[in-house]
Each structure stands twice: as C-alpha cells, then as structure tokens.
C-alpha cells in the first residue's frame, strides 16, 4: 500500500528477509496486455486522467481512469479496455519497481510531501520513475528536463506541443477558443491539463476537432473550484481538492471579487510564501484551520 512509508520497520524487515514485495499496479500489469497511459504531477492529476478518459471514450476508444483517483486499478480487469488511464502519486511510485507504460506524463512539479520524501530532489527523483520503460515520455516544458522528452506548454495565448503551435486553438483567462467557439474553463491550470492531453492525443493521432468536441462535454471534478451555492450575491466555492500552496494559488487566480478564504489541513513541510501577494490583493478575510494553522 502507498500508505506505508519505505522507512516502516516491518517493511524493512520484510525486505531484509528477501520476501517478494509488489504493488497493486504491478499485479494488474502482469495480468493484462492493455496499454497504460500513466499520469503524475504535484497538481491536476485527477482532472487530467478524467479528461483523457473522457476524450478517448467520446471517440469510441474504450478506457478507464483509475489509480490514485479513488478507483482501484483492479477495476480495470473487470472489462476489456483499449487503454487504462492511471493516476500515479509519488507514494505509489516510491514502491513500484517495474512500471511498463505506453505513455507517461509529468504535468508539473512543485514542493510537496516533503514530510514523507525528505527533500525536493528526492521527490523529483521519485516522480521521474514514471518514465522508466515508458515508450513515450511527456513533460511540462517549464521543467528542466524538457529537452529530453516530448513536451507541452501554454505560452501567452498559444498551446504548444514539442514547440509547435496548435493552430486554431488559443486561451484567455477564463476561456479556450477553438474555431471561434468559446469553451469556459475554471482556471488557467485547466488549459495546461488540456495541453497535456493534446500531447497524448497527438501521439494517438486523434484529430483536434474530436478532442475539442469531447472537451466541451467533459466532466468537471467535484471539489475543484466548485461553486456549490450562491446567497445574496455571495458565491461559496469548494476547492478542497487543493492540497498544497500551488493548487490554492491557481484556484485564487481563477476567482474574482472580494474573497473570504478558508484554508488549512494536515501539516506539510512546504512554504506558503507564494500565496502572500495574491492573498494581500484578493482576499478580504482569511480563516485558517487545521493542523497547519500555526505553521
């Protein structure tokens, strides 16, 4: 289980006894020939695997989104799929010895889970394990490894895959525009998620028209900048899927008006300095709760 730390004493004793240790992902891979598209990153994993699966299924390419998104990878064995879209966390990658992906994607990397991994360098090392044995390797161009891998980025208003502009497609603060049609988005980070999908679909030779048709019907993630009620002009937005400073920053960028921000949760070894400017500029009242309220 990814919930067990590699430093756990029982785990160490099992390793020393030469007992064979494996993971659910490795078991499933040994039982199926279905191709895996594996996605990791500090933020946006669940939204992106859901979008990839939506696009494929909409185009009669059967797939299931599973893994760290709450749907067991074993669920993928219950039917025949063309692709298994797997969300993989750093905790899962830490234990995996052999991952055989058709396409692997790293969406982004920022400081997170250092209470488990110790250092940022170690965290990056674990995330890069997703590329081992992958046939196609896709990475956000903002990272330092882009020259080694297939890459994607959103630059100004343009979508670029391997530095080539995706024609007829552009992005504004709250819309993606394709052939003069505006597709609302809940934040600029959703444009980056789409760009990662474009890189994947480029490999799979899926036409842009088909991708955008599926994107227009996408299932938005619950609890991700989710407006759940409005009272007397005051909107209540649930972004409890944001579990670090970077994702909170993206959420705040996507919201306008006077903001009352309630934030806090489990204590994590991370800096919140990136939030200072936007909180000073946009947040009317800040309420801090949880274990990390004094951090």
Go through the PLM ranges and name each one.
Residues 2-149, 201:
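Phosphate-binding loop of NTP-binding sites
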Residues 7-9, 270-273, 292-295:
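Short, glycine/polar-rich helix-capping loops at beta-to-alpha or helix-loop-helix junctions
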Residues 22-27, 140-141, 147-166, 187, ...:
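Beta-strand->loop->alpha-helix junctions that form or flank phosphate-binding loops
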Residues 39, 68, 87, 107, ...:
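Residue-level signal for inorganic ion chemistry
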Residues 42, 68, 264-266, 289-291:
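Cofactor-binding loop segments of dinucleotide-utilizing enzymes, especially the Rossmann-like FAD-
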Residues 62, 180-284:
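Nucleotide phosphate-binding/pyrophosphate-handling subdomain across enzymes
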Residues 138-141, 262-263, 282-291:
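Short internal beta-strands
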Residues 161-180, 221-227:
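Acidic-glycine-rich active-site phosphate/pyrophosphate-binding loop
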């Amino acid at each position: 289980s990814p919930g067990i730390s590699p430093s756990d004493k029982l785990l160490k004793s099992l390793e020393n006894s030469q007992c064979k240790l494996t993971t659910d992902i490795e078991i499933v891979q040994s039982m199926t020939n279905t191709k895996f598209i594996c996605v990791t990153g500090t933020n946006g994993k669940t939204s992106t695997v859901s979008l990839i699966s939506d696009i494929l299924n909409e185009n009669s390419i059967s797939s299931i989104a599973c893994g760290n998104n709450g749907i067991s990878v074993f669920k993928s064995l219950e039917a025949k799929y063309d692709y298994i879209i797997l969300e993989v966390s750093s905790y899962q990658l830490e234990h995996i010895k052999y991952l055989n992906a058709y396409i692997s994607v790293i969406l982004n990397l920022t400081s997170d889970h250092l209470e488990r991994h110790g250092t940022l360098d170690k965290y990056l090392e674990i995330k890069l394990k997703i590329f081992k044995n992958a046939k196609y390797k896709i990475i956000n161009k903002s990272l330092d490894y882009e020259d080694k891998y297939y890459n994607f980025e959103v630059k100004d208003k343009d979508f670029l895959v391997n530095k080539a502009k995706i024609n007829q497609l552009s992005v504004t603060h709250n819309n993606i525009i394709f052939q003069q049609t505006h597709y609302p988005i809940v934040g600029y980070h959703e444009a980056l998620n789409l760009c990662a999908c474009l890189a994947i679909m480029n490999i799979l030779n899926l036409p842009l028209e088909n991708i955008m048709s599926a994107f227009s019907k996408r299932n938005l993630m619950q609890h991700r900048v989710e407006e759940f009620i409005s009272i007397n002009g005051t909107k209540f937005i649930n972004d409890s899927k944001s579990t670090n400073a970077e994702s909170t920053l993206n959420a705040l960028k996507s919201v306008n008006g006077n903001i009352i921000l309630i934030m806090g949760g489990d204590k994590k070894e991370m800096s919140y300095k990136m939030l200072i400017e936007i909180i000073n500029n946009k947040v009317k009242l800040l309420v801090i709760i949880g274990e990390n309220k004094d951090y």
